[in-house]
């Protein structure tokens, strides 16, 4: 297994990860055009990490870098995390989260965080099984 941060030249791996997200999250979103995905991968405030098994994308996550006015250190908002069903419960997700946390620490981030809906029992159980520092219960409002 290998974990890597995608570059703008690795759009095909990003597309494969989006397919995994579609499967895992059971949504039928259209995959955006290649130019859009390449632009995202070129944006220093957006990152994609993938877990590879046998050279193929088995899962991954996306990160939005948040710059804050009260600290010179950014935060990493881990947005989507998905592992292909055939690779779940084999340590890939935990290894991915651990590698991302190491990356963030080595690159001067204040912290990294991820949200899970309270009723998403599997996601909450997964995150509680990782090496997190703090759990916050919050109410999320969408506009």
What is each residue range found by the language model?
Residues 27-48:
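Active-site rim helix/loop that mediates acceptor-substrate recognition in acyltransferases
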Residues 87, 91-99:
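Conserved acetyl-CoA pyrophosphate-binding loop and the N-cap/start of the following alpha-helix
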Residues 97, 104-116:
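Conserved GNAT acetyl-CoA-binding A-motif
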Residues 94, 118-137, 143:
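Conserved active-site alpha-helix within GNAT-family acetyltransferase domains
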Residues 1-16:
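A short beta-loop-alpha structural element at the N-terminal edge
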Residues 67-78, 88, 134-136:
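A conserved beta-turn-beta hairpin within the catalytic core of GNAT-like acetyltransferases
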Residues 16-29, 69:
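Helix-loop element at the rim of GNAT/NAT acetyltransferase active sites that forms part
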Residues 50, 56-65, 77, 82:
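Conserved beta-strand in the GNAT
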């Amino acid at each position: 297994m290998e974990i890597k941060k995608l570059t703008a030249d690795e759009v095909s791996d990003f597309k494969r990860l989006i397919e995994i997200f579609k499967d895992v999250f059971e949504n039928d979103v259209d995959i955006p055009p290649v130019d859009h995905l390449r632009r995202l991968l070129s944006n220093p405030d957006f990152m994609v990490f993938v877990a590879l098994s046998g050279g193929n994308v088995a899962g991954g996550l996306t990160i939005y870098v948040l710059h804050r006015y009260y600290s010179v250190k950014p935060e990493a908002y881990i947005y989507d995390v998905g592992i292909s069903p055939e690779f779940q419960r084999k340590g890939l997700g935990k290894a991915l989260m651990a590698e991302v946390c190491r990356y963030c620490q080595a690159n001067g981030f204040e912290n990294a965080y991820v949200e899970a809906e309270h009723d998403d029992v599997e996601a909450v159980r997964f995150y509680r099984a990782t090496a997190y520092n703090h759990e916050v219960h919050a109410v999320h409002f969408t506009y």
